[in-house]
Amino acid sequence: MNKSDILLNSINAFYILPENRTILKELLNKTGGISLRNLEWFITNYSKKNNLTYKTRDGKLFSVHCAYKSSLDGYSKKLFDPFCRSNKMQYIVPGTSDKISTTVAQLNFIRWCIKNSIVDYIRNHHSDLFNKSGILQKVTPV
């Protein structure tokens, strides 16, 4: 087994949970109100510029940009990337018969966003982050 296969086993265990599966499908099918491009921009630009730190669901203090850089260093772009820049595969979403064209790197990135409450944060602050034209705007972090 290579790194990608080992990671995929862990990813499958994560996406077997219905709430995680739902968020994955919403992001990849563009039905949840958050695009992958906006998610990536929020993590790489907004969180760095605003030094964004918040408490996650389990009460831990989380610094978005620092954690992102640390995860990127640990996984590299080959295994941690919001966009399908490597070999795509037909991923069967655990617990369903749904197939999605994606990469291990993209599945891992989305898992990281869900686990660290980034998707929740963007949803809870959506009106503050986005203006009416759909562009992220600078706001003071909460």
What is each stretch, according to the model?
Residues 1-80, 91, 104:
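Long, compositionally biased non-globular segments that serve regulatory/targeting/scaffolding roles
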Residues 54, 95, 136-137:
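Surface-exposed beta-strand edges and their flanking turn/coil or helix-capping segments
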Residues 78, 107-112, 116, 120:
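Amphipathic alpha-helical interface elements that mediate macromolecular binding in regulatory proteins
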Residues 80-103, 107:
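Low-complexity, intrinsically disordered regions in eukaryotic regulatory proteins
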Residues 49-50, 87-90, 116, 120:
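Amphipathic alpha-helical interaction segments
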Residues 115-141:
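Long, highly charged low-complexity segments enriched in Glu/Asp and Lys/Arg with interspersed Ser/Thr
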